[in-house]
């Protein structure tokens, strides 16, 4: 955790402070909340499909007809894998990517903190990540494997930032514990 790496907090500069100082743009936040959230099965397939349908139905509006892209922060790797399958089933043409690190990479440290982050602990195999990478390769004409995961990660980073004009961008990126802080993408305007 941050406390383990840096010890006690010296100062807090919150997003509300950054907005007030005009260092970042403000947010348009839309909340969708059920009547009673206790006892929700977040892995319920019907629930997940309804959420995916909502995202796809509102996607063009949210991303200004593809001018921007979206990021879906997901709670766990098994949940990400299920959402990935659902999105591919509901809309096979959406340019979707997914990024998480699998157990075989768990010895790698995060560049800035020196600690592991975003790693799958739930019996996730390299094969499951490779299936996602194969879809990505077919969509974008790349040839990434789990052996060159860092190149795949870098490619996703560039596509999300829409930095290269000749590089086709991603529409939607599914993540677990990654791409959430310190990620500056001017063309990313929607966070689920």
Regions found by a protein language model. Name each.
Residues 1-41, 48, 180-192:
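Signature of the SF2 helicase/ATPase Hel1-core->accessory helical subdomain module
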Residues 40-175:
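Conserved C-terminal RecA-like helicase domain
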């Amino acid at each position: 955790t941050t406390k383990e790496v840096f010890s006690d907090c010296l100062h807090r500069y919150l997003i509300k402070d950054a907005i007030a100082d005009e260092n970042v743009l403000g947010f348009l936040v839309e909340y969708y909340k059920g009547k009673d959230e206790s006892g929700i099965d977040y892995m319920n397939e019907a629930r997940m499909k309804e959420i995916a349908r909502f995202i796809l139905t509102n996607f063009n509006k949210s991303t200004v007809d593809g001018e921007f892209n979206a990021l879906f922060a997901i709670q766990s790797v098994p949940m990400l894998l299920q959402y990935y399958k659902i999105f591919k089933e509901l809309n096979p043409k959406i340019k979707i990517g997914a990024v998480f690190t699998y157990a075989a990479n768990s010895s790698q440290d995060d560049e800035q903190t020196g600690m592991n982050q975003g790693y799958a602990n739930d019996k996730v195999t390299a094969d499951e990540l490779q299936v996602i990478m194969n879809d990505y390769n077919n969509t974008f004409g790349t040839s990434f494997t789990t052996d060159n995961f860092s190149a795949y990660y870098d490619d996703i980073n560039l596509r999300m930032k829409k930095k290269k004009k000749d590089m086709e961008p991603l529409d939607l990126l599914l993540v677990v514990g990654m791409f959430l802080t310190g990620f500056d993408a001017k063309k990313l305007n929607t966070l689920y």
